[in-house]
A protein has these predicted regions:
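Short beta-strand segments
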Residues: 35-38, 61, 108, 177-179
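Hydrophobic helix-and-loop "lid/oligomerization" segment in the mid-to-C-terminal part
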Residues: 1-9, 28-31, 111-189
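Solvent-exposed alpha-helices and their adjacent loops that cap or buttress functional pockets
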Residues: 26-29, 49-52, 67, 97-99, ...
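Short alpha-helices
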Residues: 62-128
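N-terminal small/polar loop signature for handling phosphorylated ligands or for N-terminal nucleophile
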Residues: 1-49, 53
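Short helix/loop capping segments that flank catalytic or ligand/cofactor-binding pockets
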Residues: 44-46, 68, 185-186
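Short glycine-rich anion-binding loops that position phosphate/pyrophosphate groups of nucleotides
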Residues: 39-42, 63-65, 180-183
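Hydrophobic/aromatic beta-strand patches that form the interior of the parallel beta-sheet core
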Residues: 33-35, 56-60, 72-75
Length: 189
């Protein structure tokens, strides 16, 4: 098991600190149902072959490019995030949402909406955000933890990306690239 990533610990208070387990560190064979959420084909497929034939696989996502087979697939591109989908499931099935769950769900929404700044922000996701805040999820603190605590390495990496950026006036597109070497050299891994 991995501890909660250090930058996220201010969002949770003991004894509610969650422990994160990587799939490789969990005996997934011992579960009847395995759920994967958010960009599931960008990692879930690397260990899916370890599942038993009789295990139920549930995929939850808001990205349109998910084509992985599952027993239950819940993909809705009209939602801002997988967290919004999970919230609505809990709401429809009258599943109580604890403070740590409300915080985690709001964190997912804030991340996928760019702190409510992206074009995927809808009145519905704003309502969900308000409901999670009513349950105690700390919006300002989540925004600060996710977006305002930029490490020096991240700033250096942005510098490299901007330095290499090229503008194409015919399309209005700006293109840049960063490499794994850049990540390493900027200490932004």
């Amino acid at each position: 098991s991995d501890p909660l990533p250090e930058k996220l610990t201010p969002l949770f208070t003991a004894p509610a600190l969650p422990v994160f387990h990587l799939p490789t560190d969990v005996d997934v064979q011992s579960y009847d149902v395995v759920m994967a959420a958010d960009s599931v084909d960008r990692g879930f497929d690397t260990w899916r072959s370890t599942l038993r034939e009789d295990q139920i696989v549930v995929l939850i996502d808001h990205h349109p490019d998910i084509d992985m087979p599952a027993d239950i697939t819940l993909i809705d591109t009209e939602h801002s995030s997988s967290s919004e989908i999970v919230y609505e499931y809990f709401e429809q099935h009258q599943i109580p949402i604890t403070l740590p769950v409300a915080t985690a769900l709001l964190m997912g929404i804030v991340f996928d909406t760019g702190n409510f700044k992206h074009t995927n922000v809808t009145p519905r996701v704003m309502r969900v955000g308000v409901e999670l805040m009513k349950l105690g999820a700390p919006l300002a603190q989540i925004g600060n933890v996710l977006f305002a605590q930029t490490r020096v390495g991240g700033v250096k990496l942005w510098g490299r990306a901007l330095e290499r950026a090229r503008y194409f006036p015919t399309t209005g597109m700006v293109v840049t690239a960063i490499t794994t070497r850049d990540l390493r050299e900027c200490d932004a891994e």
